[in-house]
């Protein structure tokens, strides 16, 4: 279930970059320059919030479309075999138990054991599983994974993530413009308006701060994984969820999911750049949390 967050974050950053460049070319950044010499901090904060939350909410609105196109997921409109029929009926039953609308159900081609859920709200979601999951997990284990994803939807994790990302975006944009202003004035000695140094420095600072701010989003993601595990235990049974996580420990293979959507999966393998950037807690910690609940 490691696809959701990287998809959201990368889409979000791409939208922010595109909007920043577009607004700069349109001259909107000029409202941040009061009397040609100093930043207008009130205007900057409003600008940052509009741009920051705008990028986040656009990413949320695009999440289902992006996930389908990036994984090649095929939505099951009419089940063509017993496996698809079981998959749709299991999600339908779990969605009813969780009190949410019936999500779209899809399958995407990948040898990994993986699944993800995304969408704008509890009644407009997508739950997708890999062919590898259907081949390598028994139905009890697969049922637990589906319940985990349904719990993400029921908990409103995508909306909460969008709000957190909006706050993070706001501060990233705000601070990057201040850094650009300082460099433009102190290093390049611009005395009136903002020169090219402000634009270039602001974009670089925005990208660097955006990467660092990812730590906050990843921490949030790890906490939500524990909650989704607990939700799965309530819907499908704790033993089934523990068995599913154990299966991942035994069968895990390097993910073939696009990196941009890796954070909405289930695997939770350790990140090469450290735990701060992990979207999922280690599997053993998740198992221990379930067993001690």
Swiss-Prot record:
It is found in: Cell inner membrane. It comes from the Bacteria. GO terms for cellular component: plasma membrane. Keywords: Cell inner membrane, Cell membrane, Hydrolase, Membrane, Metal-binding, Metalloprotease, Protease, Transmembrane, Transmembrane helix, Zinc. Its EC number is 3.4.24.-. The active site is at residue 149. This is Protease HtpX homolog. It comes from Nitrosomonas europaea (strain ATCC 19718 / CIP 103999 / KCTC 2705 / NBRC 14298). The lineage of its organism: Bacteria, Pseudomonadati, Pseudomonadota, Betaproteobacteria, Nitrosomonadales. The gene is htpX.
């Amino acid at each position: 279930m490691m696809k959701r967050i990287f998809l959201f974050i990368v889409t979000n950053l791409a939208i922010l970059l595109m909007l920043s460049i577009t607004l700069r070319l349109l001259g909107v950044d000029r409202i941040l320059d009061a009397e040609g010499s100093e930043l207008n901090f009130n205007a900057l904060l409003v600008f940052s919030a509009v741009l920051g939350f705008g990028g986040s909410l656009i990413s949320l609105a695009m999440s289902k479309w992006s996930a389908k196109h990036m994984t090649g997921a095929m939505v099951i409109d009419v089940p063509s075999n017993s496996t698809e029929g079981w998959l749709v009926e299991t999600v339908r039953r779990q969605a009813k138990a969780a009190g949410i609308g019936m999500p779209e159900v899809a399958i995407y081609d990948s040898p990994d054991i993986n699944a993800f859920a995304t969408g704008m709200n509890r009644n407009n979601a997508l739950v997708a599983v890999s062919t590898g999951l259907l081949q390598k997990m028994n139905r009890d284990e697969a049922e637990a994974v589906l319940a985990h994803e349904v719990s993400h939807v029921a908990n409103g994790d995508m909306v909460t993530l969008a709000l957190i990302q909006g706050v993070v975006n706001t501060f990233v944009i705000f601070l990057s413009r201040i850094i650009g202003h300082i460099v433009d004035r102190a290093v390049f000695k611009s005395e009136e308006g903002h020169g090219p140094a402000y634009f270039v420095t602001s974009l670089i600072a925005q990208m660097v701060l955006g990467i660092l701010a990812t730590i906050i989003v990843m921490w949030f993601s790890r906490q939500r994984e524990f909650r989704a595990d607990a939700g799965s235990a309530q819907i499908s049974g704790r033993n089934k969820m523990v068995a599913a996580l154990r299966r991942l420990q035994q069968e895990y293979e390097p993910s073939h999911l696009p990196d941009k959507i890796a954070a909405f999966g289930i695997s939770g393998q350790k990140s090469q750049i450290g735990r701060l950037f992990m979207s999922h807690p280690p599997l053993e910690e998740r198992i221990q949390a379930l067993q001690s609940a």
